[in-house]
């Protein structure tokens, strides 16, 4: 279970237990990582549908979209390796690379 880190509240005890978000992830996937760790340790991961959050300015991904796509997919590889082991990461690597390539191809301007 995981929720978007765009708006995240966590108990201080959970932060002490796991430390902060894993800085090896660049901008993406650290919330998934933290959520999986919390879930495996027996913490509840809760979505509050009545909460309203406005992300007024979000331009990080727009500045260098290809670099952000690559960073996201590198983070996915790290996530698989961290949580499921080297063998799973080796199996997942071609799929992650293919998905990265496909996303980048869709993002290219037309002919």
Q: What are these regions, as identified by a protein language model?
A:
Residues 9, 26, 33:
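A short, conserved beta-strand element in the Rossmann-like catalytic core
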Residues 29, 33-110:
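Active-site-adjacent helix/loop segment of glycosyltransferases
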Residues 1-17:
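A recurrent flexible, glycine/aromatic-enriched loop bordering the glycosyltransferase active site
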Residues 20-23:
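Conserved nucleotide-sugar donor-binding catalytic segment
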Residues 15-16, 26, 54:
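Nucleotide phosphate-binding site architecture
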């Amino acid at each position: 279970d995981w929720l978007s880190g765009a708006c995240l509240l966590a108990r201080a005890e959970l932060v002490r237990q796991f430390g902060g978000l894993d800085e090896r992830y660049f901008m993406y996937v650290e919330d998934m990582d933290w959520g999986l760790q919390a879930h495996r340790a027996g913490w509840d991961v809760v979505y509050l549908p009545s909460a309203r959050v406005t992300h007024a300015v979000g331009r990080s991904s727009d500045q260098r979209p290809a670099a952000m796509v690559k960073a996201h997919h590198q983070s996915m590889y790290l996530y698989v390796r961290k949580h499921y082991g080297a063998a799973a990461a080796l199996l997942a690597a071609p799929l992650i690379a293919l998905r990265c390539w496909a996303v980048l191809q869709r993002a290219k301007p037309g002919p």
